[in-house]
Amino acid sequence: MLEKLIILDFGSQTTQLIARRIRELNTYCEVYPYNKLPEDLSGVRGIILSGSPYSVYDSKAFRIELSELRGKLPLLGICYGAQSLVHQAGGKVEPCDSREYGRTHLTLRQPEDALLTGLQSGTTVWMSHGDTITSLPEGFEVIAGTEDVPNAAFRIRGEKTWGVQFHPEIYHSEEGTKLLGNFLDICGMKRDWTPASFIEATVQELRERLGDDKVILALSGGVDSSVVAVLLNKAIGRNLTCIFVDHGLLRKGEFERVLQDYEHLGLNVIGVNAKEKFFAALSGVTDPEQKRKIIGRGFIEVFDEEARKLKDIKWLGQGTIYPDVIESLSITGMVIKSHHNVGGLPERMNLRLVEPLRMLFKDEVRRVGLELGMMPHLIHRHPFPGPGLGIRILGEITEEKATILQNADDIYMSLMREWGLYDQVWQAGAILLPVRSVGVMGDERTYEYTVALRAVTSMDAMSADWVHLPYDFLAKVSNEIINKVRGVNRVVYDISSKPPSTIEWE
């Protein structure tokens, strides 16, 4: 049985960073909403309680009865998680005179404590909280503090339970990863979860689950579906048929390039031209969520049609990854935005889903692909959304707009490669805005569309920063697009980070 660590999410923006740090330590972990702890804890070796935007005293605060967890498994509370442990045990948590935010230095009171093994006294840690622990309950003891936060870290005597008021998952906490590693050692984790072990376990699981069943896989040309294809091919061979749909919203020349790439991989691929179907279904639709769902339904309908042409197809493969799953439903149950690989599926789908990568972050998918021996140019392609340019054309989607955006995007991507910038950027693309503006070309007045350029850096798509592209490069891209793409007379650059913005505009 796969051993794992569970992270209970109380709504912190850094919960996914905790998961990333644990995964980087070759340990498998899963994130669950604070109130959705699985009943079956077989294989679970420990639990981390995340931070939260709330105070423990807020009426809207997310709460669970922590006494039911204490003593059963090793437990680590971070920020709000630590304060909840104290508050529920009768200690005092009070508002800070001023919000404690930023770097500070940690003084070790008990450096021999198992959680602090190998840490240096004075190490930098990152604080971000409006409340602070002012009094510990009986049985709790301080193991580290800072100048302003004397109870920065504590343990509970007789239990494998700890709490820290700082954020070890944040990069600014210099030895945060070491502290998390110490907790994994306390949990008895083997730290042997690697791309190779994932491949071995996943291939075995796929063989057991699928048996002699046949699978069709939704190919997009991106790294996620590419890795799924190779994994499934490794597990079931010729029982896999790949379906690549041209919905008219791919990048320029994408359909032909993708078919050629997969032919080289020895995969059985069927190309389907469904442009007319998608453009007809999207006619007149402007709502972003509706566009996503229409595109999602269209994909499934096409797959169903293709499956009926084949014999005994029972499964639909998809390249869903962990950020897709997490972003599709927030902790409060409010949809942030549905993902093509998660939402938009018809209620009566004729095929069952198989999603081998649904618990991996993007960088982990890439490492698995390299371990599988896939071509680097497939593995290091920028992420591209399942709905394609459909969520980069704001407002109504038409074939004319799709052509405009394909041409603009092609210029942008080509120049990125020419200038040696492509591999320095996590994701980039052009967006066609539903905005026309006045311009002048020659002696004539124009009234045409605006294209926005987007380029971000990221580790796992859970957060992202905009890229400071050279001005000369941006000027070159702007001039090329305006001069060569009919229908565009203005180019702008998006300088928004995630959060609060998302990587895609829709």
Curated annotation (Swiss-Prot):
Residues 193-381 form the GMPS ATP-PPase domain. InterPro entries: Class_I_gatase-like, GATASE, GMP_synth_C, GMP_synth_GATase, GMP_synthase, GMPS_ATP_PPase_dom, NAD/GMP_synthase, Rossmann-like_a/b/a_fold. The active site is at C79 (nucleophile), H167, E169. It comes from the Bacteria. Pathway: Purine metabolism; GMP biosynthesis; GMP from XMP (L-Gln route): step 1/1. Residues 4-192 form the Glutamine amidotransferase type-1 domain. GO terms for cellular component: cytosol. Keywords: ATP-binding, Glutamine amidotransferase, GMP biosynthesis, Ligase, Nucleotide-binding, Purine biosynthesis. Gene3D superfamilies: 3.30.300.10, 3.40.50.880, HUPs. CDD domains: GATase1_GMP_Synthase, GMP_synthase_C. HAMAP family: GMP_synthase. Homodimer. Catalyzes the synthesis of GMP from XMP. This is GMP synthase [glutamine-hydrolyzing]. It comes from Porphyromonas gingivalis (strain ATCC 33277 / DSM 20709 / CIP 103683 / JCM 12257 / NCTC 11834 / 2561).
